[in-house]
Amino acid sequence: MEPRKLSETTPEDYARLGMKSGLEIHQQLATRKKLFCRCPVIRPYSEEYDAEILRHMRPTLSELGEYDGTALMEFKTKKEIVYQIRQETVCTYEMDDTPPFELNEEALDIALEITMLLGCNLVSEVHIARKQYLDGSIPTGFQRTTILGVDGSIPYKGRRIGIRQLGLEEDACREVSDVGHLRTYRTDRLGFALIESVTYPDMRTPQEVAEVAQLLRRLARSTGKVHTGIGAGRQDVNVSIEGGRRVEIKGVSRIPLIPLLVHNEAFRQAALLEIKAELERRGVTAASFRADASNVTELVAGTQYYPLAKALRDGLEARAVVLRGFRGILSWRTQPETTFAKEISDRVRVIACLNRIPNIAHSDQEGETLSSTEWTRIKKAARAGDRDTIVLVWGDRRDVETGAGEIALRARDALDGVPNETRQALPDGTNGFERILPGPDRMYPDTDLPPIAITEDRIERIRSIMAERP
């Protein structure tokens, strides 16, 4: 289906795409203390801090002895993580120097109230699990989380939207900056009690997704026991179309942004499936796929293309990756004002930490680029044919090696259509690569805290003061 504007797309168009969407709504609870320690919850946040701590993150094996793909991806970035800490808002628990305190009972009561408002079946015992986070947003490398209820629903326009589960977990740090191999966080909101309401993929149009998000937000606010304001509530949106895969758009801060984000993601997936079909038509398969990399620094030493020329003046190197059979593919439109080349550039930016844009050039691109003579010279040296595309990447030797590998991996993923990814919501309604979508191997039991029984007395006490559920 040809891409079109949101305002020109009908529910029937989304039905033809087979679009489905679900939500993960995160909402801070208005507790006095944090979830697993007794540090105060202070809002609004402060920009002041008393000290900095440096950490490096490394993946650990899951309960089944396997590594999570997202954790391995984050480890590949070789990031140094700096935490800006304020004595008033953190303790040794957040820095992973002491075990957790008992679960905050006030937070548990509020979370159970919202779980019942969503009509979920309550668990009989609370079991804490650990969810790996190797991006550094939690100093321990994992988030403590628990499920409180499953299989609920809320009414919406004559039907019901299913609630898969509601969980209670600790909030992560606030990111300050992410440049090269250095990522900086502030720890003031770290450990805040947070609920995560997860719906089934029951929404069929972008507008429905936004309206259901609004319903869930209003329901949580009806308790009067949640924080409001910037950063207190965040939405993750899951989108898939027929033939595609679930893609998570992470951290949507404003509900009005949701329709355009969902619309663009649906048509991005349609474009990726068209690319897959075109590669199949050309006979490019997993068995025949080739991506050959070579150092071409000397071949482009005199280039006038400014981004590359500056890198070479700084003593960096250039590497060319030949994608066999990919001619024209990188110029294929995937989102408004965006082509498949950005799918590759994003991977290089995030994983190889080459975040000075542009970080790649390719032989099919129009506008400012290398001269035709330089491209011909590279093609000849790399033995590229008329059906091939060359992607050039430049930077520090170690990062360029990683970048060349990511170019090949993302091109290989094109043969499968839509990769499972977590993607970042951008202000213009498009999205960009953030990380590989996590799998079940990121979860494992927490051994520091015992189970907590959810008694009938507790349920009745909460039910006696809660609002009537929809």
Locations of regions flagged by a protein language model:
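Basic, nucleic-acid-interacting segments
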Residues: 1-466
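Conserved nucleotide- and phosphate/pyrophosphate-binding catalytic cores
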Residues: 468-470
